Amino acid sequence: MSDIETVSSFVEGAPPGELADVIADIKSLTLETNPDIVNSLTPAFEKYNEEQFVTVKLPGSSQPVIISSYNSLGDGRYFDVESSSSFTFDHTTQKASAVQSHVLEGAQADLVKSTLKSIGPYVDEHFANAAHGVYPIESDSKIAIVIVGNKYSPNNFWNGRWRSLYILDPSSGALEGSLKVDVHYYEDGNVRLLTNKPVSSTISSANGAGIVREISAMEKRYQEELNKGFVSLSEGAFKGLRRQLPVTRQKIEWDRVTSYRLGQDIGNGGSRR
């Protein structure tokens, strides 16, 4: 594996909200051997930004829009249906520029707009720091529905991201997708949760309200599965990692701690060797 491939894998595997830290580490590690290596990582940045559904605010707007392969126009330009605009996105700096008008037309335009109208309130209610997008794909034969929610808490040593992707075939009502959770906790350790849940369903009424209703039901079930999994881990595998201590259910009287056997062992540790 070449140096570029190795460093690219670091970029593509960066935890949520920590890409800048990864880049800083790469620069530090390659300062003497290859100080310009970051300039060669544009393909890795593009892959990361599109796969992670990175969000950006367009100039003059406070509303975040999603970067993904589903709303790519090629040559670094992307479009946003809700704002009827297209823009250039710099994958290295994660900045948007050159905003232009982009009016959605085509066979799925009405379905895309009705789905956008229905999914907005759902996302606002259930996700923090979230963005969503609905796009026509595959020669206007299907639509892609994308949701991303980010929660960054570096002061508490953790960051997290939820990603939902759904592909709807209006002709059959088939809805297929994946739900992904990525959480990184790094206080006095390094723990990362990565999940990928494939989902599928059939929409009897292919309209915005029906689509969002089914999405809500699938995501609720998955959230319940995750909660059960956390309880199982806490009571099972994680509990087994902890050193077992006897439970006396008695408060320690700290002013008398030396009278306890543990205190005696500590106090006389030197003479007992």
Curated annotation (Swiss-Prot):
One of its GO terms (cellular component) is F-actin capping protein complex. Keywords: Actin capping, Actin-binding, Cytoplasm, Cytoskeleton. GO terms for molecular function: actin filament binding. Gene3D superfamilies: F-actin capping protein, alpha subunit, F-actin capping protein, beta subunit. The keyword Metal-binding does not apply. PROSITE patterns: F_ACTIN_CAPPING_A_1, F_ACTIN_CAPPING_A_2. It comes from the Eukaryota. It is found in: Cytoplasm, Cytoskeleton. SUPFAM superfamilies: Subunits of heterodimeric actin filament capping protein Capz. GO terms for biological process: actin cytoskeleton organization; barbed-end actin filament capping. InterPro entries: CapZ_alpha, CapZ_alpha/beta, CapZ_alpha/beta_2, CapZ_alpha_1, F-actin_cap_asu_CS. Belongs to the F-actin-capping protein alpha subunit family. Heterodimer of an alpha and a beta subunit. F-actin-capping proteins bind in a Ca(2+)-independent manner to the fast growing ends of actin filaments (barbed end) thereby blocking the exchange of subunits at these ends. Unlike other capping proteins (such as gelsolin and severin), these proteins do not sever actin filaments. This is F-actin-capping protein subunit alpha. It comes from Gibberella zeae (strain ATCC MYA-4620 / CBS 123657 / FGSC 9075 / NRRL 31084 / PH-1) (Wheat head blight fungus). The lineage of its organism: Eukaryota, Fungi, Dikarya, Ascomycota, Pezizomycotina.
